[in-house]
């Protein structure tokens, strides 16, 4: 969406004013964080979306609501502990995955700093995507779009506030907090 692209543009402009390597650290942390929702989250959503669509079309609100609630519980049960684990083990994770050659200890620290603030997004991004699919199952495409625009606005404001005190970690935290609104 345009709002998402504007948010990304502001993010890139702000990170370009930070220390050398900040953009790379943020990108590497984002890649690591995106693996779990990309694999686990997508699997859950792929299974639940057809069920939600069928229930929304035929079986009424009660069963649809229960199925949606169960999918949120399942996502939370799997991904909240995963997010905590990533936050706690962020330095060894980054070291094992990336630290070699030009990616030195300082790059590990910078990436782990961003990953700390992105780790809750492991669950939040999947919850957001599940919620969007729940709206789509109801034939409602407007609500996710409105939420996306508001989330992008929140992200831009938080980027401006948090980049100073937290550097690339602030940009990561802004992304996480704005995704919490969308979840």
Spell out what each predicted region is:
Residues 1-183:
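Membrane-embedded alpha-helical bundles of multi-pass transporters/translocases
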